[in-house]
């Protein structure tokens, strides 16, 4: 919350905890196209916050918020990690293999191969930066790189799952229907590039703090 208006917009912000059940706090779920409601909008109408719940120093809340955002983005980037059942496995089960044992759809096979290579590189990079963080080096803008690329990988994975299932991704009643989960995951993945800071925000951070590009 803002406790001082005399400085810049990033100064004068304090990090204060408050009870979400406090009078004046209203939370409304936002229903996504997947049908779930993991997002919400919160309204504050004359809500009281107490100085005894101040975290850190007064006026230094922005630094705390940035620290938390760094770790939130790192967590969200994990959506791009390889799932238990790979895209290739699902495609083989659905489409089948050719005489050489490879996925019968050659175009989809190449696309999946590129995705899997990108996932391996992403995992290795995350492991390296994780070791650097354990050694005392801060994540810095790397969290924005991970958040952007990890969520884009997750969207690619869900797109490939949908492509592999084809018409089976459409819903019907019956015990053999698997497409419901896949299509819902695909729809839900669109929110990954919004939560924790949109992909556009992450690209701006990368441009300024990593590449040193000037403001537009």
Annotated model-derived regions:
Residues 64-72, 76-77, 165-216:
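Glycine-rich phosphate/cofactor-binding loops in nucleotide/flavin-utilizing enzymes
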Residues 1-28:
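A short core secondary-structure module
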Residues 9-12, 37, 56, 198-199:
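Short glycine/proline-enriched turns and hinge-like loops at secondary-structure junctions
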Residues 15, 39, 43, 62-64, ...:
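Tryptophan-centric aromatic hotspots in well-structured domains and transmembrane helices
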Residues 24-124, 192:
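Glycine-rich beta->alpha junctions and the first turn(s) of the following alpha-helix
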């Amino acid at each position: 919350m803002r406790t001082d208006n005399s400085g810049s917009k990033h100064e004068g912000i304090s990090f204060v905890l408050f009870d979400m059940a406090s009078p004046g706090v209203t939370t409304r779920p936002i229903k996504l196209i997947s049908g779930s409601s993991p997002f919400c909008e919160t309204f504050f109408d004359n809500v009281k916050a107490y100085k005894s719940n101040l975290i850190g120093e007064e006026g230094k809340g922005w630094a705390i918020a940035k620290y938390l955002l760094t770790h939130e983005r790192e967590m969200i980037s994990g959506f791009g990690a390889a799932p238990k059942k790979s895209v290739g496995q699902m495609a083989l089960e659905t489409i089948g293999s050719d005489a050489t044992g490879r996925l019968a759809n050659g175009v989809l096979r190449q696309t999946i191969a590129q995705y899997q290579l990108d996932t391996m590189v992403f995992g290795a990079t995350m492991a390296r930066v994780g070791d650097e963080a354990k050694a005392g080096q801060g994540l810095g803008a790397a969290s924005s790189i991970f958040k952007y690329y990890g969520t884009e990988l997750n969207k690619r994975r869900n797109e490939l799952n949908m492509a592999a299932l084809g018409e089976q991704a459409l819903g019907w009643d019956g015990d053999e229907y698997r497409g419901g989960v896949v299509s819902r995951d695909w729809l839900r993945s669109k929110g990954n590039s919004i939560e924790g800071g949109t992909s556009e925000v992450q690209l701006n951070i990368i441009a300024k703090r990593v590449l040193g590009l000037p403001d537009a």
